[in-house]
UniProtKB/Swiss-Prot annotation:
Protein known as: LWamide neuropeptides
Taxonomic placement: Eukaryota, Metazoa, Cnidaria, Anthozoa, Hexacorallia
Subcellular location(s) per record: Secreted
Basic and acidic residues bias (residue ranges): 23-53
Cellular component aspect of the GO annotation: extracellular region
Gene source species: Anthopleura elegantissima (Green aggregating anemone)
Reported function: Metamorphosin A may be part of an internal signaling system involved in control of metamorphosis.
Major subcellular site: secreted
One of the protein's GO biological processes: neuropeptide signaling pathway
InterPro entries per the UniProt record, alphabetical: Collagen_Structural_Proteins
Length: 514
């Protein structure tokens, strides 16, 4: 019985062992398959990773090469320019491959040199040349305004229409004729201009565009604000008629200033019968410079040999001049109440001055020498009339827009003392240099802060032009944050080796045949 039980247990044990072996085998097979699968997956992943890495390396290498290429071709950014990416109105190219002065790179601006070696020279716009410049096209050299519609002033861009002019079809305010048949200086050809001669109706001033009417003049038929006329010569000009040469005011009633239009009445003068404010006598019997003959005017030489010299009025000396009275020589304004500027007409009160004392001058009082504005309340500019307050200044208590401090404790040039104006030197030795406003620096100046030296526009938000107020942002620029403003030098230091290297690399190629 015991043996039988033992055999049963042995059989059960063998059976269990067999089952266990089968399971282990299956597990082993499964594990093996899993391991194979895992190994295969891992190998695939590794392979893909290696491929990705290789591609990444290749891409990085290509990108690095591309960056190196870009960097090598990138602008060194030396010199003056407008904007770096979108070239501004004027400057030097920030791209060593496009040197020279220009306006915009793609659409050249109003003035500059061509940024394209194939279009050198000065110009306005490349396709539509601007108001002034040289032709960017070697086939259209010279100075001009616009190429198709020449602008206000320039040389013809067309070799067939040389010279200086305003507009080609409708000549502008001033220039030379673009038509070789109509040389000379003029304003507009058909329409009356504010300044310049016209062909049909000559303007206020210019040369005749008609060889038959040479010379300088104002209007031909209608007197203008300034210039000579043919029939009724204006205030000043040369005769447009060869028979009446010279400078003059009006022909029949000589104007304020000019030369006689009559060869028998040469010289500079004001009016012929009643000499004007200033000029030479048109009468050989009354030579010299003067104002009025009987009642000498504001300034001039006496028309009377017995009353020589420069003066204003004889009895009541005017604003400035020399005394017409040998007993009262010198330059002055008024004798008793000195005018705005002059020398004392009184030997006891020599020197230059204005009023007792006026806006500017030297003291007429030997006890108060020097240049100044007003004695009690110094004006906008001058030297102190008080030896205790020497120097140039604006106002003593509230310094004006420009001057030197009248206070030895606040020397230097400045605008206003408490709130420095647009331009000046600091009136405070602790804030030296040139600047705009002290607290909020203006459009241009030197930093009043030793920690922010240099020229700049605004300190916090640099304006259109200046030097960096920060030692880390050297050079000339427009705006500090974008750094590449409308005009300036790179805020980065130049990258040329030396001046010769700079000249060599930034030289403007000369067009062939020039």
């Amino acid at each position: 019985m015991a043996l039988k039980c033992h055999l049963v247990l042995l059989a059960i044990t063998l059976l269990l062992a067999q089952c266990s072996g089968s399971v282990d085998k299956k597990d082993s097979t499964t594990n093996h398959l899993d391991e194979k699968k895992t190994d295969s997956t891992e190998a695939h992943i590794v392979q893909e990773t290696d491929a990705l890495k290789e591609n990444s390396y290749l891409g990085a290498e290509e990108e690095s090469k591309e960056e190196d290429k870009k960097r090598s071709a990138a602008p060194q950014q030396p010199g003056l320019w407008g904007k770096r990416q979108k070239i501004g109105l004027w400057g030097r190219s920030a791209d060593a491959g496009q040197p020279g002065l220009w306006g915009k790179r793609q659409s050249p601006g109003l003035w500059g040199r061509s940024a394209d070696a194939g279009q050198p020279g000065l110009w306005g716009k490349r396709q539509n040349p601007g108001l002034w410049g040289r032709s960017a096209d070697a086939g259209q050299p010279g100075l001009w305004g616009k190429r198709q519609n020449p602008g206000l002033w320039g040389r013809s861009a067309d070799a067939g229409q040389p010279g200086l002019w305003g507009k080609r079809q409708n000549p502008g305010l001033w220039g030379r004729s673009a038509d070789a048949r109509q040389p000379g200086l003029w304003g507009k050809r058909e329409i009356y201009a504010l300044w310049g001669g016209k062909r049909q109706n000559p303007g206020l001033w210019g040369r005749s565009a008609d060889p038959g009417q040479p010379g300088l003049w104002g209007k031909r038929e209608l007197v203008g604000l300034w210039g000579g006329k043919r029939q009724n010569p204006g205030l000043w000009g040369r005769s447009a008629e060869a028979g009446q040469p010279g400078l003059w005011g009006k022909r029949q009633k000589i104007g304020l200033w000019g030369r006689s239009a009559d060869p028998l009445q040469p010289g500079l003068w004001g009016k012929r019968q009643n000499p004007g404010l200033w000029g030479r006598s048109a009468d050989p019997q009354q030579p010299g410079l003067w104002g009025k003959r009987q009642n000498p005017g504001l300034w001039g030489r006496s028309a009377d040999p017995q009353q020589p010299g420069l003066w204003g009025k004889r009895q009541n000396p005017g604003l400035w001049g020399r005394s017409a009275d040998p007993q009262q020589p010198g330059l002055w304004g008024k004798r008793q109440n000195p005018g705005l500027w002059g020398r004392s007409a009184d030997p006891q009160q020599p020197g230059l001055w204005g009023k007792s004392p006026g806006l500017w001058g030297r003291s007429a009082d030997p006890q108060q020498p020097g240049l100044w504005g007003k004695r009690q309340n110094p004006g906008f500019w001058g030297r102190s009339a008080d030896p205790q307050q020497p120097g140039l200044w604006g106002k003593r208590q509230n310094p004006g827009l420009w001057g030197r401090s009248a206070d030895p404790q606040q020397p230097g040039l400045w605008g206003k003392r408490q709130n420095p104006g647009l331009w000046g030197r600091s009136a405070d030795p602790q804030q030296p240099g040139l600047w705009g406003k002290r607290q909020n620096p203006g459009l241009w100046g030197r930093s009043a802060d030793p920690q922010q030296p240099g020229l700049w526009g605004k300190r916090q938000n640099p304006g259109l032009w200046g030097r960096s107020a920060g030692s880390g942002q050297l050079g000339l620029w427009g705006k500090r944050q974008s750094r590449i403003g409308l005009w300036g030098r790179s805020a980065e230091p130049p990258q040329f080796e030396d001046l010769e290297d700079l000249k060599k690399k930034s030289a403007i190629p000369q067009p062939k045949g020039q």
